[in-house]
Amino acid sequence: ADVPGNYPLNSYGASYYCTI
C-alpha cells in the first residue's frame, strides 16, 4: 500500500493494510 496503517489509503481504495 501507499501508507503503513490499517486504513484503505491506496490507489485501489480497498483495505490492503499495507500488505503490498
UniProtKB/Swiss-Prot annotation:
GO cellular component terms, A-Z: extracellular region
Location, primary (coarse class): secreted
Compartments reported by the entry: Secreted
Organism per entry: Androctonus crassicauda (Arabian fat-tailed scorpion)
Tissue-level expression: Expressed by the venom gland.
Protein name as annotated: Toxin b subunit beta
Gene Ontology molecular functions: sodium channel regulator activity; toxin activity
Keyword Aminoacyl-tRNA synthetase: no
Keyword Glycoprotein: no
Assigned keywords, A-Z: Ion channel impairing toxin, Neurotoxin, Secreted, Toxin, Voltage-gated sodium channel impairing toxin
Subunit structure as annotated in this protein's UniProt entry: Toxin b is a heterodimer composed of toxin alpha and toxin beta.
Biological function: Binds to sodium channels (Nav) and affects the channel activation process.
